[in-house]
């Protein structure tokens, strides 16, 4: 059974490479153990076996760790300490994933938060201190401080190869996280996955495959709410807060034109109220010097108002007290009604 499933998986992944490239990042895509070793070299991971082949003893490795020259990622797995310190949480998690794929052996599939990291999704709301893997079976999971091995049926069409590592597809990753994380986190992941090419029909199929599992009702709600037009985690979180507070839901990334001229694309648009909402608008001009960015943003906002719309905005700090944002929205609606 395992051999037959692995053969189907390899065939499916080959078809994904040829016909469905949008499910796999346009980075290196290699196959099998050789690919994992190549990826480990790219990340400058040193294994105990490699060190022995190069003539380095266990005692020398231990001394290098004590001197702070090497960082021990796991038993028999090392990286230069200065390089490890430079890695952010996502890159460190990828290191841990590469280690886990070797220790878990064939048949283990990177999943849940770890799959989100492998796909390059927004992971701000996820804990990255544990590697998540899924074995294609109905029982036999286990959990430690650093590894959560989930038992679950994973159809071959829900697996892709990323850097040679079997990983749950974008749709399966979203559904797994939508079942097991808060709604807000699931929406951030889902919005980002749609921007990365996740197809709604694949989400529907993954929801169908997961029938009967815990958390499916909230996963279905999240699946109906996600939108590719939310272009940042802050915009996704804002949409959730609007939903929770009973706001009329806006159109996302609406183009404003006036006199036949394109003015700009706005984050949130309420046509019936004549109101535009902008989250952290300065990010649109990242790379400009601060003074020029402020000037360009002011000119853009003036042009939107000249087109007949009221504008209000908010930043990350406002998400902690969204009632303040609601008050700005209501004032903008009143100004729009008075035009």
Question: What does each of the following model-derived ranges do?
Answer:
Residues 1-215, 334-339:
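Short gly/ser-rich loop at a beta-strand->alpha-helix junction or flexible surface loop bordering the NTP-binding
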Residues 6, 10-33, 37-39, 50, ...:
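Surface segments flanking catalytic/ligand-binding clefts of nucleic-acid enzymes
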């Amino acid at each position: 059974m395992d051999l037959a499933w692995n053969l189907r998986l390899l065939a499916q992944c080959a078809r994904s490479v040829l016909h469905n490239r949008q499910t796999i990042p346009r980075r290196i895509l290699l196959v099998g153990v050789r690919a994992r070793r190549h990826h480990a070299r790219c990340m400058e991971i040193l294994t105990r076996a490699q060190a022995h082949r190069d003539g380095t003893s266990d005692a020398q490795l231990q001394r290098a760790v004590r001197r702070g020259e090497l960082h021990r990622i796991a038993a028999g797995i090392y990286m230069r300490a200065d390089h490890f310190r430079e890695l952010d949480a996502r890159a460190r998690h990828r290191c841990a994933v590469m280690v886990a794929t070797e220790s878990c052996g064939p048949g283990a599939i990177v999943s849940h938060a770890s799959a989100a990291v492998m796909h390059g999704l927004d992971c701000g709301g996820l804990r990255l201190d544990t590697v998540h893997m899924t074995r294609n079976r109905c029982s036999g999971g286990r959990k430690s401080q650093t590894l959560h091995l989930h038992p679950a049926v994973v159809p071959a069409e829900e697996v892709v190869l990323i850097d040679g590592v079997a990983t749950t597809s974008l749709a399966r990753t979203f559904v797994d996280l939508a079942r097991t994380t808060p709604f807000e986190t699931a929406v951030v992941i889902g919005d980002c996955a749609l921007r990365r090419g996740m197809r709604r029909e694949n989400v529907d199929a993954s929801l169908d495959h997961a029938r009967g599992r815990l958390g499916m009702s909230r996963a279905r709600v999240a699946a109906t709410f996600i939108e590719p037009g939310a272009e940042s985690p802050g915009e996704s979180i804002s949409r959730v807060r609007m939903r929770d507070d009973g706001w009329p839901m806006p159109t996302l990334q609406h183009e404003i034109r006036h006199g036949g001229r394109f003015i700009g694309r706005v984050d949130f648009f309420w046509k019936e109220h004549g109101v535009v909402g902008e989250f952290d608008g300065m990010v649109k001009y990242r790379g400009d010097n601060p003074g020029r960015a402020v000037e360009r943003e002011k000119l853009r906002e003036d042009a939107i108002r000249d087109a007949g719309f009221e504008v209000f905005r908010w930043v990350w700090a406002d998400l902690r007290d969204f009632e303040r944002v609601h008050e700005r929205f209501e004032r903008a609606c009143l100004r729009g009604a008075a035009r």
